[in-house]
Amino acid sequence: MVLPHEPEFEQALHELETSLQPFLTTNPQYKKALEIIQVPERVLQFRVTWEDDQGKPQVNRGFRVQYNSALGPYKGGLRLHPTVNLSILKFLGFEQTFKNALTGLSMGGGKGGSDFDPKGKSDNEIRRFCVAFMSELFRHIGQDTDVPAGDIGTGAREIGFLFGAYRRLKNEFTGMLTGKGINWGGSFIRPEATGYGLIYYVEHMIAHACPEYSLDRPSTLVAISGSGNVSQFTALKVIELGATVLSLSDSKGSLISEKGYTKEAIEKIAELKLKGGALEAIVDDLGAGYTYHAGKRPWTLLPQVHIALPGATQNEVSQEEAEALVKAGTRIVAEGSNMGCTEEAIAIFENSRRASRAGVWYAPGKASNCGGVAVSGLEMAQNSQRLAWSTQEVDAKLKSIMAECYQICYTAGSRWSGEKVAEGVAEGEALPSLLSGANLAGFIKVADAMKEQGDWW
């Protein structure tokens, strides 16, 4: 059920429908499930009026899309960005539903946020906005109903303000938000989880498809886009393992280091981003070996790339950029961002995979970046038990979840993708579609739960 002004949601739905076609041909009863599952259970939209530092009232739109609760409470982030609209949040909530299913934890899918822009705002303005936002949202969320989290524009500071507002409004201390501070109900590894989880997933892909590009080798070249939380911890984990990080980027351009980023450089960038700065402002501080390219993403700037990890935002890899990555010898593309590749880019990668064992193997964000929400689920579990697990315990559980997620996607893609092996590729040598596998495994799990609960028949 797509409206004409919902391009992002239409793209996500079309991707799922395309992946499901071979399965639906042999299991036509699930067509009704697809028809029902694409409609969110509830969409909330509300006015947020807040006071700026000049004492003047400002207004923004607030949203919460409670997409599907067949597997557990609605779970998904709150995005604060001027581009936020209902189409983007429906697409994110839709994807979140299947992503959460792939973690194996008891979580439904949802997404929310506002067109409020935290950039350029004072701490007091952000606090007043968060209090105003929560004064409406609090009626609709709770630890057993809907558990929001952070997202673009919503970091530790915003989560703290939102949690405090809820606690005062409800006069209760519960785990109704994840991404909390470690001293008041948060979990170790949560800030790092999406980036670390992405690398844990990619390690399984490398081991199966191209062990010569193991991440413990300095000769393995890794391109990363974005420079926020996900990209920073992705880069730090790659550097820790021993491979070479070539790039980071932001909305204004890309910062390339052909000799590789250092841990110290990533830490400086993290400090810069915490203050809302742009990458171009830090080039001189990083010293020789770093080149800034204004207005460009990294994908066309690198002559050789082995692993490409989009980590910025949706549709950040175009058809032209995908072709450049294939030409650069890329073997693995795994999304740290949600729907980071356009449909045209995905088609390039999938055609490359089908044509050759040495082609590009693509992993969609709903699988490869599910580490963040997985640790959010672990935070919910810790809150329910009123205890805290150690860093080592949480990291071990995250590795286990990502390994299981990879195996589920691999198995489902092998079984249900309906693909014919390309000429010249041996039957057992072909790489399965992880895109089809993720979509199929997530969809079937949610659809079966919905049927057992009477949501379709």
Curated annotation (Swiss-Prot):
Alphabetical list of Pfam families matching this protein: ELFV_dehydrog, ELFV_dehydrog_N
Protein's recorded name: NADP-specific glutamate dehydrogenase
SUPFAM superfamilies registered for this protein in UniProt: Aminoacid dehydrogenase-like, N-terminal domain (SSF53223), NAD(P)-binding Rossmann-fold domains (SSF51735)
PANTHER family in the record: NADP-SPECIFIC GLUTAMATE DEHYDROGENASE 1-RELATED (PTHR43571:SF1)
UniProt keyword terms in alphabetical order: NADP, Oxidoreductase
Source organism: Agaricus bisporus
Subunit structure: Homohexamer.
Active site: 111
PROSITE patterns to which the protein is assigned, alphabetical: GLFV_DEHYDROGENASE
A single Gene Ontology CC term: cytosol
Molecular function, one GO term: glutamate dehydrogenase (NADP+) activity
